[in-house]
Amino acid sequence: MQTMTETLQKLIGKPLVESTDQEIYLALLDLVRSKSAAQVRPVNGRKLYYISAEFLIGKLLSNNLINLGLYDDVRDALAAAGKSLSDIEEVEPEPSLGNGGLGRLAACFLDSLATLNLPGDGIGLRYHFGLFHQSFADGLQNELPDPWLNEHSWAEKTDITYPVTLAGKPYTARLYKLAVTGYEGRTNTLNLFDLDTIDESIVHDGIQFDKTAIAKNLTLFLYPDDSDEAGRMLRIYQQYLMVSAGAQLILAECAARGCNYHDLADYAAIQINDTHPSMVIPELIRLLGEKGIKFDEAVKIVTDTCAYTNHTILAEALETWPRSYLDKVVPQLMPVIEKLDAAAKKRTNDTGLAIIDADDRVHMAHMDIHFTHSTNGVAALHTEILKESELNGFYKLYPEKFNNKTNGITFRRWLLECDPALVKEIESLIGPGFRKDAAELEKLLPYAEDANVLQKFSQVKADNKKALADWLEHTQGVKVDPTAMFDIQSKRLHEYKRQQLNLLYLIHQYFEIRAGHTPAVPLVSIFGAKAAPAYIIAKDIIHALLTLSKVIAADPLVAPWLQVVFVENYNVTAAEKMIPACDLSEQISLASKEASGTGNMKFMLNGALTLGTMDGANVEISQQVGNENIYIFGQTSSQVIHRYAAGDYNPADWYEGDPNLRRAIDFLTGPEMLAAGKEENLARLQHELKTKDWFQTLPDFNAYVVRKGQALSDYACDPLGWRRKCLINISKAGFFSSDRTIAEYNSDIWHLGE
């Protein structure tokens, strides 16, 4: 039997010691492809098709090597030749197929499906430049293309194409296939569609391009800027390309397995991930009509086949489109949507549940709920809010459709791959069973009283912090003190996630330190976030944080105690460095606004403690670990919802009534900030906080300051107690495995393989 060294040298055609990192990477790509192909299994019974606008899959080499059981052999073979697997990984570009939690969840779900030996493929688009590559200049976010495709991409071109009609014109969707390996499981597929006519050269001045040149631009960017009509139309073009090609793929695959279309629900389960793929419902009905199936039967078939996941409580994210847009882009769908609307209106007199409303807007989520057999939320609190308030009318109409599936994360990437030293310590105590059964982490609980074990885990954290400090210096040009407390808020930049609350805290700390009230421990506050190109206030928050970072660094009194670092172009690769090094995880969204969150789970799994509101999955984390092992603050979701309903929140009252808050907000346009930043951006953010503050930052400010102060004090003054809390968090993280989530989806909704 060949050794790994011999296998790689045969693939490369020369000794490893003489091979470049690029040559070794390509050899490993070939090796993974051949091994993953051997894990493809035949499909019997029902197969899942998970349709999502984004899949934030991250780099794939190490993840695939781990899942295929090759990682240790490859690492050792390379080391023997004086090579480093981490250097080889640098050759690999990160796929630009997603942006935030929605896309990362989809990627975790694909991993778990394959690991659990369940037949389930993804369907999405092959974006060329992703959302954008973020860079900072003059304290401002700039957007550039984020290229990743090359001839050696993991996504392999096929000869399979499907015709798609957009605005009456014919286009040809090309299928690319990307293998998804499971941990000691099967290989599934991520199906990505593209047009051969895409022209990357039309992009100029950052991420500007002609939004009307559909044949050239359709898959260039994820979520093209929708601040104008052309951008909004482009999103509909994208969504229809995805669902039309996807629906044709599903029907073709099912027919090849013996489906006669009448029995489609016995062959396929389709999960609609948020509202972007909603048009798959009318498109499937239209295609079944072309197969000779009458409308009413087609509606029943599609309803029995499709299920919908709601990911948001924010009205802005529940997509609605002007009927005129759909008339132009997908005129072939409008007769179907009109019939569906008429059918829905026969079921209820509640006009608020209509698919087409009185203003001629088409509500995608409404179509999803009416014409799928399942609607799920993604955390217990989120699902209750949907049932009791946001979607209450639908819940009264279809109580049997509503269910909860609390999100999860794949422990292969977020523990085995990104924190191998922690894995080694865990295995030395409880064995390797947790790799396949995350619930086994609970066996760590008795060690929470073992000071020697706690010290070893603490050393792993210290080493990870040193590694992050080195990475920050190498990639960001920033030096940080690895012995300081690392406080991290990394997630999409949005006012409801409240990076602005953290900003006000940091300004407050700046004043406290200048007044001689030094904190219990030096604090390094690390951010990672992209703001949507047209989201002005979000970009102003980034500017304020970057400006504050400069002000603090220039102050000899404050700099030894406080540092603000904003990581440029936050992505999965950066997350894999930051999460294992975190001490305090910031999960501070306004209660009732975060559906679930999954960053909270990743940080917890890697031994960080959570500072958070009772929102999303924070609620379930607190239930798992106990209130004494998490730092909860702020209003409850019911208090927030009541305040919105009363309509009596006036941020000016809080600004005028709290000297510390007023001092922090005034500082945004104080001489120190204006000397380092731009008045237009800082004044606009200040005005927003004083006059609007839609996500109630000000009422939670004092509670946040107090609770964060308690966390710093505990970290500095009771290190043993802090370590104990960290170990308890790790031991209780098993519930948040995406394997558990997927098993629940399968038992309650999909019934795959049956």
What are these regions (language model features)?
Residues 1-754:
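A conserved ligand/cofactor-binding region detector
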